[in-house]
Swiss-Prot record:
It catalyses: a di-trans,poly-cis-dolichal + NADP(+) = a di-trans,poly-cis-polyprenal + NADPH + H(+). PANTHER family: DFG10 PROTEIN, POLYPRENOL REDUCTASE. Pathway: Protein modification; protein glycosylation. This is Polyprenal reductase 2. It is an enzyme of class 1 (oxidoreductase). Plays a key role in early steps of protein N-linked glycosylation by being involved in the conversion of polyprenol into dolichol. Acts as a polyprenal reductase that mediates the reduction of polyprenal into dolichal in a NADP-dependent mechanism. Dolichols are required for the synthesis of dolichol-linked monosaccharides and the oligosaccharide precursor used for N-glycosylation. It is found in: Cell membrane.
C-alpha cells in the first residue's frame, strides 16, 4: 500500500540489492581474463577484504602498503555496522508497532471466520462484504508480520553489537573502505526491506498526526494509553509460518553464538597478530560455519516475514552471494597460510561450496 508523496520504496530497494549483488556474481563466474574477468575478481577481492585477507604481504613495498592503508579502516569499526543496524531497526520497529497498535487492532480472528461462513450462506452481497473484510484482515496480518520480523532483526543486531564488544578481540588488521560502506548500507537496507510494504502507510499515519498536534496543541490531544495485552496479543495470534521462522532463527542464532565463541577464543591477546586453525563444532566440516549460521538466521526472518515482499528475497540473495564469496576467499587464505589445513573442508555449505 503506497501512500501519495512517497517514492516507490520497494523498487528502489530491489534495484539497490541487485546493484550490490551483480558484481559479486560476475566475479564468481569464469569470465576470461581477456575480457577483464581476472581484474574484476581482484577488485572485488580487494574491496571485500578485511582482517587477515587485507593485510599486505611482507614483500610489498612500504609505498604500496601506505597507499593501501589510505583506503582502509580499522577492523574494529565493525561495531559501526551494528550501531547503525540497531538505530535503523529500532526506529522502524517502534514506528510500525505503534502504527499497528493504534490503527490495526484487534485482529478479531473469530469474527472474521464467522463472517466468511455467513457470507456463503446468505448470498453474493454479503460474500462481497466478506471478501472486503478478508482483505482488511490480510492487511492487518501483513503489518503485524512485519512487526514480528523486525523484532527478530532487532534481536540479531543487538546480539551482534554485544558480541563485537565482548566476544571478539580484533587484531590491528584493517578492512577496505568499500567493504565498510557496504556494511553500513546493508544494516540500513536490511530493516528497510523487511518493513518496505508498511513504511509508506505508517509514514502517512504519522504525517497526519503532526498537523493535528499543531492545530490542537498538546493540552487538547487525547491522552495516550497503551494496553500491554493489546500490544502483544496480535503477535501471539500470527500463523504457524511466523513461529516456524522464529524457530529457524533461534537455531541459527544459537549456532552462530557457538561459532563466534570459538573464533573469539582463538585470540586471547587482543594485540596478537597470530592466526590459528579453528576446530570443533561445524568448523570441522566448513571453514566459515558462522556465515552458514547467518544464512540460516536470515532464512528464518524471510519465513517469518511471510516471504511476500520482493526486497526481502533480494536481500537474502545478496546475503548468499556475499557470504559465499567471502567464505571462499577465507578458505583460500587458510590454504595459503597453513600447509596442514584440511582440504576436505568446504567453504560455507557442506557438499556444495
Amino acid at each position: 500500500m503506497e501512500s501519495e508523496g512517497w517514492p516507490a520504496l520497494q523498487p528502489l530497494l530491489c534495484f539497490a540489492w541487485i546493484a550490490a549483488t551483480l558484481p559479486i556474481i560476475a566475479a564468481a563466474l569464469p569470465i576470461p581474463t581477456a575480457v577483464g574477468g581476472h581484474l574484476l575478481r581482484r577488485l572485488l577481492s580487494a574491496f571485500s577484504s578485511r582482517g587477515k585477507t587485507v593485510r599486505p604481504s611482507p614483500a610489498s613495498s612500504s609505498g604500496s602498503s601506505s597507499s593501501k592503508a589510505k583506503f582502509t579502516v580499522p577492523q574494529k569499526y565493525f561495531m559501526h555496522f551494528y550501531v547503525v543496524g540497531v538505530l535503523a531497526t529500532t526506529i522502524l520497529l517502534l514506528a510500525i508497532w505503534f502504527y499497528a497498535y493504534m490503527k490495526l487492532t484487534p485482529l478479531l480472528l473469530e469474527s472474521s471466520s464467522y463472517s466468511t461462513i455467513f457470507s456463503h450462506l446468505v448470498g453474493s452481497n454479503s460474500f462481497s462484504f466478506g471478501r472486503v473484510r478478508s482483505r482488511t484482515m490480510g492487511h492487518k496480518y501483513r503489518v503485524w508480520r512485519t512487526v514480528f520480523a523486525l523484532l527478530l532483526m532487532e534481536v540479531q543486531v543487538l546480539r551482534r553489537l554485544y558480541e563485537t564488544e565482548h566476544v571478539f578481540h580484533y587484531s590491528p588488521a584493517r578492512m577496505h573502505i568499500v567493504g565498510y560502506l557496504t556494511g553500513l548500507f546493508y544494516y540500513v537496507a536490511a530493516p528497510l526491506s523487511l518493513a518496505s510494504s508498511c513504511i509508506p502507510e505508517a509514514a502517512e499515519y504519522f504525517q497526519g498526526q503532526v498537523p493535528e498536534f499543531v492545530v490542537k496543541g498538546r493540552a487538547r490531544m487525547p491522552d495516550l494509553v497503551i494496553d500491554s495485552s493489546s500490544l502483544l496479543q496480535p503477535l501471539l495470534k500470527l500463523g504457524w509460518t511466523q513461529w516456524i521462522g522464529a524457530v529457524i532463527f533461534i537455531w541459527g542464532s544459537l549456532h552462530q553464538i557457538r561459532c563466534h565463541a570459538i573464533l573469539g577464543s582463538l585470540r586471547e591477546h587482543k594485540d596478537s597478530d597470530e592466526y590459528v586453525i579453528p576446530c570443533s563444532d561445524c568448523f570441522n566440516r566448513v571453514s566459515c560455519p558462522h556465515y552458514l549460521a547467518e544464512l540460516v538466521i536470515y532464512f528464518g526472518m524471510l519465513v517469518a516475514s511471510g516471504a511476500e515482499d520482493i526486497p526481502v528475497w533480494f536481500l537474502f540473495i545478496f546475503l548468499i552471494t556475499n557470504l559465499s564469496f567471502a567464505a571462499v576467499e577465507t578458505y583460500n587464505w587458510y590454504l595459503q597460510k597453513f600447509e596442514d589445513y584440511p582440504r576436505s573442508r568446504y567453504a560455507i555449505i557442506p557438499f556444495v561450496c
